[in-house]
Protein backbone atom coordinates (compact mmCIF):
# COMPACT_ATOMS: atom_id res chain seq x y z
CA UNK A 1 0.00 0.00 0.00
CA UNK A 2 1.21 3.56 -0.73
CA UNK A 3 1.88 4.94 2.75
CA UNK A 4 1.88 8.48 1.47
CA UNK A 5 -1.61 8.15 0.05
CA UNK A 6 -2.81 6.44 3.21
CA UNK A 7 -1.40 9.27 5.32
CA UNK A 8 -3.15 11.84 3.13
CA UNK A 9 -6.39 9.91 3.46
CA UNK A 10 -6.19 9.91 7.25
CA UNK A 11 -5.35 13.60 7.32
CA UNK A 12 -8.41 14.34 5.21
CA UNK A 13 -10.60 12.38 7.59
CA UNK A 14 -9.01 14.12 10.58
CA UNK A 15 -9.76 17.51 9.05
CA UNK A 16 -13.37 16.44 8.43
CA UNK A 17 -13.72 15.23 12.01
CA UNK A 18 -12.26 18.44 13.43
CA UNK A 19 -14.49 20.58 11.23
CA UNK A 20 -17.65 18.74 12.24
CA UNK A 21 -16.80 18.73 15.94
CA UNK A 22 -16.37 22.52 15.83
CA UNK A 23 -19.51 23.03 13.79
CA UNK A 24 -22.09 25.29 15.52
CA UNK A 25 -24.77 22.87 14.39
CA UNK A 26 -25.71 20.26 16.96
CA UNK A 27 -25.96 17.58 14.28
CA UNK A 28 -22.36 16.56 13.65
CA UNK A 29 -23.48 13.49 11.71
CA UNK A 30 -25.15 15.64 9.04
CA UNK A 31 -22.01 17.77 8.87
CA UNK A 32 -19.89 14.69 8.23
CA UNK A 33 -22.18 13.44 5.45
CA UNK A 34 -21.98 16.79 3.65
CA UNK A 35 -18.21 17.03 3.87
CA UNK A 36 -17.40 13.40 3.14
CA UNK A 37 -19.09 13.56 -0.26
CA UNK A 38 -16.51 16.15 -1.30
CA UNK A 39 -13.56 13.90 -0.45
CA UNK A 40 -12.34 12.13 -3.57
CA UNK A 41 -12.09 8.36 -3.37
CA UNK A 42 -8.69 6.83 -4.12
CA UNK A 43 -7.65 3.29 -5.05
CA UNK A 44 -4.99 1.47 -3.08
CA UNK A 45 -3.08 -1.63 -4.24
CA UNK A 46 -3.74 -4.77 -2.29
CA UNK A 47 -1.90 -8.03 -2.03
CA UNK A 48 -0.79 -9.98 -5.13
CA UNK A 49 -0.96 -6.83 -7.27
CA UNK A 50 -4.78 -6.82 -7.05
CA UNK A 51 -6.72 -3.64 -6.64
CA UNK A 52 -8.59 -3.09 -3.39
CA UNK A 53 -11.30 -0.55 -4.18
CA UNK A 54 -11.65 2.21 -1.63
CA UNK A 55 -11.43 -0.06 1.41
CA UNK A 56 -9.38 2.30 3.61
CA UNK A 57 -11.84 5.08 2.91
CA UNK A 58 -14.80 2.93 3.80
CA UNK A 59 -13.20 1.46 6.92
CA UNK A 60 -12.08 4.77 8.34
CA UNK A 61 -15.17 6.68 7.28
CA UNK A 62 -17.45 4.02 8.75
CA UNK A 63 -15.78 4.33 12.15
CA UNK A 64 -15.93 8.10 11.99
CA UNK A 65 -19.54 8.20 10.81
CA UNK A 66 -20.64 5.75 13.49
CA UNK A 67 -18.98 7.85 16.17
CA UNK A 68 -20.67 11.05 15.01
CA UNK A 69 -24.04 9.38 14.49
CA UNK A 70 -24.28 7.96 17.98
CA UNK A 71 -22.87 11.11 19.47
CA UNK A 72 -25.90 12.98 18.11
CA UNK A 73 -28.51 10.41 19.10
CA UNK A 74 -30.16 10.53 22.55
CA UNK A 75 -29.58 7.55 24.77
CA UNK A 76 -32.69 5.39 24.92
CA UNK A 77 -33.55 2.94 27.65
CA UNK A 78 -35.85 0.10 26.64
CA UNK A 79 -36.61 -0.58 30.28
CA UNK A 80 -37.53 2.97 31.26
CA UNK A 81 -40.55 3.26 33.52
CA UNK A 82 -40.90 7.04 33.76
CA UNK A 83 -41.97 8.86 30.60
CA UNK A 84 -41.25 12.20 32.28
CA UNK A 85 -37.54 12.65 33.09
CA UNK A 86 -36.73 14.19 36.44
CA UNK A 87 -34.67 17.33 36.94
CA UNK A 88 -35.55 18.75 33.52
CA UNK A 89 -37.81 21.55 32.34
CA UNK A 90 -38.69 20.12 28.93
CA UNK A 91 -38.96 16.89 26.96
CA UNK A 92 -38.33 15.95 23.34
CA UNK A 93 -41.53 14.95 21.58
CA UNK A 94 -40.07 15.07 18.07
CA UNK A 95 -36.47 15.79 17.11
CA UNK A 96 -37.50 18.19 14.32
CA UNK A 97 -39.18 20.73 16.63
CA UNK A 98 -38.37 22.43 19.92
CA UNK A 99 -38.73 20.45 23.12
CA UNK A 100 -42.05 20.71 24.95
CA UNK A 101 -42.07 22.36 28.39
CA UNK A 102 -43.13 20.19 31.31
CA UNK A 103 -44.96 23.21 32.73
CA UNK A 104 -46.93 25.93 30.92
CA UNK A 105 -47.80 29.08 32.86
CA UNK A 106 -49.33 32.50 32.22
CA UNK A 107 -45.79 33.88 32.31
CA UNK A 108 -44.87 32.31 28.97
CA UNK A 109 -48.21 31.50 27.29
CA UNK A 110 -51.64 33.22 27.06
CA UNK A 111 -53.32 30.76 29.44
CA UNK A 112 -55.47 31.14 32.55
CA UNK A 113 -53.58 28.89 34.98
CA UNK A 114 -50.56 26.62 35.37
CA UNK A 115 -50.58 23.36 33.41
CA UNK A 116 -48.43 20.24 33.86
CA UNK A 117 -47.58 17.86 31.02
CA UNK A 118 -49.86 14.83 31.10
CA UNK A 119 -48.96 13.02 27.87
CA UNK A 120 -47.21 13.52 24.57
CA UNK A 121 -46.79 11.93 21.16
CA UNK A 122 -46.90 12.44 17.43
CA UNK A 123 -49.70 12.57 14.92
CA UNK A 124 -49.18 10.47 11.79
CA UNK A 125 -51.23 10.46 8.61
CA UNK A 126 -52.54 6.91 8.64
CA UNK A 127 -52.26 6.09 4.95
CA UNK A 128 -48.78 7.47 4.23
CA UNK A 129 -47.45 7.18 7.80
CA UNK A 130 -45.63 10.50 7.74
CA UNK A 131 -45.56 12.76 10.77
CA UNK A 132 -47.80 15.82 10.84
CA UNK A 133 -47.35 17.38 14.26
CA UNK A 134 -46.09 16.84 17.78
CA UNK A 135 -48.77 16.87 20.48
CA UNK A 136 -48.55 17.67 24.16
CA UNK A 137 -51.51 17.20 26.52
CA UNK A 138 -51.51 19.18 29.76
CA UNK A 139 -53.62 19.10 32.93
CA UNK A 140 -54.24 22.11 35.15
CA UNK A 141 -52.07 21.74 38.24
CA UNK A 142 -54.91 22.73 40.57
CA UNK A 143 -57.27 20.18 39.00
CA UNK A 144 -55.20 17.05 39.62
CA UNK A 145 -57.39 16.24 42.63
CA UNK A 146 -60.45 15.98 40.35
CA UNK A 147 -59.08 12.71 38.96
CA UNK A 148 -59.29 10.85 42.28
CA UNK A 149 -62.41 12.77 43.37
CA UNK A 150 -64.29 11.63 40.25
CA UNK A 151 -62.85 8.20 39.50
CA UNK A 152 -63.02 6.52 42.91
CA UNK A 153 -64.40 3.33 44.43
CA UNK A 154 -67.93 4.75 44.69
CA UNK A 155 -67.88 5.62 40.98
CA UNK A 156 -66.52 2.17 40.15
CA UNK A 157 -69.24 0.29 42.06
CA UNK A 158 -72.01 2.53 40.75
CA UNK A 159 -71.32 2.28 37.02
CA UNK A 160 -69.47 -0.98 36.41
CA UNK A 161 -70.46 -4.60 37.01
CA UNK A 162 -67.26 -6.28 35.86
CA UNK A 163 -65.26 -5.36 38.95
CA UNK A 164 -62.52 -7.79 39.95
CA UNK A 165 -62.81 -8.04 43.74
CA UNK A 166 -59.31 -9.47 43.95
CA UNK A 167 -57.97 -6.14 42.67
CA UNK A 168 -57.90 -2.74 44.34
CA UNK A 169 -60.26 0.00 43.08
CA UNK A 170 -57.29 1.74 41.49
CA UNK A 171 -56.28 -1.43 39.65
CA UNK A 172 -59.83 -1.93 38.39
CA UNK A 173 -60.10 1.66 37.20
CA UNK A 174 -56.70 1.41 35.51
CA UNK A 175 -57.76 -1.76 33.70
CA UNK A 176 -60.93 -0.11 32.37
CA UNK A 177 -59.08 3.00 31.25
CA UNK A 178 -56.39 1.08 29.40
CA UNK A 179 -58.17 -1.99 28.03
CA UNK A 180 -61.80 -1.09 27.38
CA UNK A 181 -62.33 1.63 24.78
CA UNK A 182 -66.06 2.10 25.36
CA UNK A 183 -65.74 2.32 29.15
CA UNK A 184 -62.70 4.57 28.95
CA UNK A 185 -64.71 7.05 26.85
CA UNK A 186 -67.39 7.16 29.54
CA UNK A 187 -64.81 7.66 32.30
CA UNK A 188 -62.88 10.39 30.49
CA UNK A 189 -66.10 12.20 29.53
CA UNK A 190 -67.16 12.17 33.19
CA UNK A 191 -63.77 13.58 34.14
CA UNK A 192 -64.15 16.38 31.61
CA UNK A 193 -67.68 17.09 32.88
CA UNK A 194 -66.20 17.65 36.35
CA UNK A 195 -64.70 20.93 35.13
CA UNK A 196 -61.18 19.61 34.69
CA UNK A 197 -59.12 22.13 32.75
CA UNK A 198 -56.78 20.90 30.06
CA UNK A 199 -54.54 22.21 27.32
CA UNK A 200 -53.25 20.83 24.03
CA UNK A 201 -50.08 22.10 22.38
CA UNK A 202 -49.87 21.25 18.67
CA UNK A 203 -46.54 21.89 16.96
CA UNK A 204 -46.32 21.10 13.23
CA UNK A 205 -43.23 19.16 12.16
CA UNK A 206 -43.60 20.49 8.60
CA UNK A 207 -44.97 23.72 7.13
CA UNK A 208 -48.76 23.75 6.96
CA UNK A 209 -51.61 26.27 7.16
CA UNK A 210 -54.51 27.19 9.43
CA UNK A 211 -57.04 25.54 7.14
CA UNK A 212 -55.41 22.13 7.50
CA UNK A 213 -55.12 22.50 11.27
CA UNK A 214 -58.81 23.41 11.54
CA UNK A 215 -59.85 20.52 9.31
CA UNK A 216 -57.83 18.17 11.47
CA UNK A 217 -59.60 19.36 14.62
CA UNK A 218 -63.03 18.96 13.02
CA UNK A 219 -62.19 15.41 11.92
CA UNK A 220 -60.98 14.51 15.40
CA UNK A 221 -64.12 15.90 17.07
CA UNK A 222 -66.39 14.20 14.53
CA UNK A 223 -65.00 10.76 15.42
CA UNK A 224 -66.31 10.87 19.00
CA UNK A 225 -68.79 7.98 19.53
CA UNK A 226 -71.54 10.29 20.85
CA UNK A 227 -71.65 12.53 17.77
CA UNK A 228 -74.74 10.77 16.39
CA UNK A 229 -76.71 11.63 19.56
CA UNK A 230 -75.72 15.31 19.49
CA UNK A 231 -75.82 16.29 15.83
CA UNK A 232 -77.69 19.58 16.12
CA UNK A 233 -75.82 20.88 19.15
CA UNK A 234 -72.46 19.85 17.72
CA UNK A 235 -73.24 21.45 14.35
CA UNK A 236 -73.69 24.80 16.11
CA UNK A 237 -70.45 24.23 17.99
CA UNK A 238 -68.50 23.46 14.82
CA UNK A 239 -69.87 26.68 13.33
CA UNK A 240 -68.44 28.51 16.35
CA UNK A 241 -65.15 26.72 15.79
CA UNK A 242 -65.07 27.91 12.20
CA UNK A 243 -65.58 31.51 13.35
CA UNK A 244 -62.96 31.27 16.12
CA UNK A 245 -60.50 29.70 13.70
CA UNK A 246 -61.00 32.28 10.97
CA UNK A 247 -57.34 33.19 10.56
CA UNK A 248 -55.88 32.26 7.19
CA UNK A 249 -52.36 31.76 5.93
CA UNK A 250 -49.42 29.52 6.57
CA UNK A 251 -48.20 27.99 9.81
CA UNK A 252 -44.49 27.38 9.93
CA UNK A 253 -42.85 24.25 11.22
CA UNK A 254 -42.20 24.63 14.98
CA UNK A 255 -44.96 27.21 15.53
CA UNK A 256 -47.58 26.32 18.15
CA UNK A 257 -51.35 26.07 18.25
CA UNK A 258 -52.46 26.29 21.88
CA UNK A 259 -55.93 24.95 22.73
CA UNK A 260 -57.09 25.59 26.30
CA UNK A 261 -60.14 23.84 27.75
CA UNK A 262 -61.56 26.28 30.30
CA UNK A 263 -63.42 25.38 33.49
CA UNK A 264 -66.79 26.23 31.90
CA UNK A 265 -66.12 23.86 28.98
CA UNK A 266 -65.24 26.58 26.48
CA UNK A 267 -62.19 26.34 24.21
CA UNK A 268 -59.70 29.15 23.70
CA UNK A 269 -57.38 29.05 20.66
CA UNK A 270 -54.03 30.83 20.60
CA UNK A 271 -51.24 30.91 18.04
CA UNK A 272 -47.54 31.17 18.83
CA UNK A 273 -45.20 32.50 16.16
CA UNK A 274 -42.03 30.83 17.43
CA UNK A 275 -39.70 32.68 15.07
CA UNK A 276 -40.69 36.08 16.46
CA UNK A 277 -41.92 34.74 19.83
CA UNK A 278 -45.29 36.44 19.37
CA UNK A 279 -48.67 35.21 20.63
CA UNK A 280 -52.17 35.84 19.31
CA UNK A 281 -55.45 34.81 20.94
CA UNK A 282 -57.50 33.71 17.94
CA UNK A 283 -60.93 33.13 19.47
CA UNK A 284 -63.16 31.19 21.87
CA UNK A 285 -65.70 28.41 21.27
CA UNK A 286 -68.34 28.45 24.02
CA UNK A 287 -70.14 25.29 22.90
CA UNK A 288 -69.14 22.73 25.53
CA UNK A 289 -69.45 19.68 23.30
CA UNK A 290 -66.64 20.86 21.03
CA UNK A 291 -64.08 21.00 23.82
CA UNK A 292 -65.34 17.86 25.52
CA UNK A 293 -65.31 15.76 22.36
CA UNK A 294 -61.90 17.06 21.27
CA UNK A 295 -60.09 16.26 24.52
CA UNK A 296 -62.00 13.03 24.93
CA UNK A 297 -60.61 11.92 21.58
CA UNK A 298 -57.11 12.90 22.63
CA UNK A 299 -57.35 10.83 25.82
CA UNK A 300 -59.30 7.71 24.91
CA UNK A 301 -61.07 5.60 22.33
CA UNK A 302 -59.82 3.62 19.37
CA UNK A 303 -59.67 6.63 17.03
CA UNK A 304 -57.36 8.89 19.00
CA UNK A 305 -55.22 11.06 16.68
CA UNK A 306 -52.08 10.11 18.61
CA UNK A 307 -52.06 6.68 20.32
CA UNK A 308 -48.74 7.51 21.96
CA UNK A 309 -50.10 10.71 23.50
CA UNK A 310 -53.19 8.82 24.66
CA UNK A 311 -51.12 6.08 26.29
CA UNK A 312 -48.71 8.39 28.10
CA UNK A 313 -51.59 10.59 29.29
CA UNK A 314 -53.62 7.63 30.62
CA UNK A 315 -50.54 6.21 32.35
CA UNK A 316 -50.07 9.57 34.08
CA UNK A 317 -53.76 9.86 35.01
CA UNK A 318 -53.60 6.45 36.67
CA UNK A 319 -50.88 7.70 39.00
CA UNK A 320 -53.33 10.39 40.16
CA UNK A 321 -56.10 7.93 41.10
Swiss-Prot record:
One Gene Ontology CC term in the entry: mitochondrion
Record carries keyword Transit peptide: yes
InterPro entries in the record: Chalcone_isomerase, Chalcone_isomerase_3-sand, Chalcone_isomerase_sf
Pfam families associated with the record: Chalcone_2
Main location (coarse class): mitochondrion
This protein's UniProt keywords: Mitochondrion, Transit peptide
Targeting signal (transit peptide) range: 1-72
Compartments in which it is found: Mitochondrion
GO molecular function: intramolecular lyase activity
Cross-referenced PANTHER family: FATTY-ACID-BINDING PROTEIN 2 (PTHR47284:SF3)
Family under the similarity heading: Belongs to the AIM18/AIM46 family.
Entry protein name: Altered inheritance of mitochondria protein 18, mitochondrial
Organism: Saccharomyces cerevisiae (strain JAY291)
Gene that specifies this protein: AIM18
Amino acid sequence: MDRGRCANMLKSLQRTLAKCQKSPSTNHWQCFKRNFTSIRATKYPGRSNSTFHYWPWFAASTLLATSLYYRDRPVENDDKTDAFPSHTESIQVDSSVSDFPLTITALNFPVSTTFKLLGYGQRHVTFLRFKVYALGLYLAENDENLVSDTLNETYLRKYFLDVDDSKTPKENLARLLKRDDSKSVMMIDDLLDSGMRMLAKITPVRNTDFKHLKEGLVKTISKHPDVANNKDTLAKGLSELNDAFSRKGSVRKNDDLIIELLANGALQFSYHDSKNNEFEVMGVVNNQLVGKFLFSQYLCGEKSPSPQAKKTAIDKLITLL
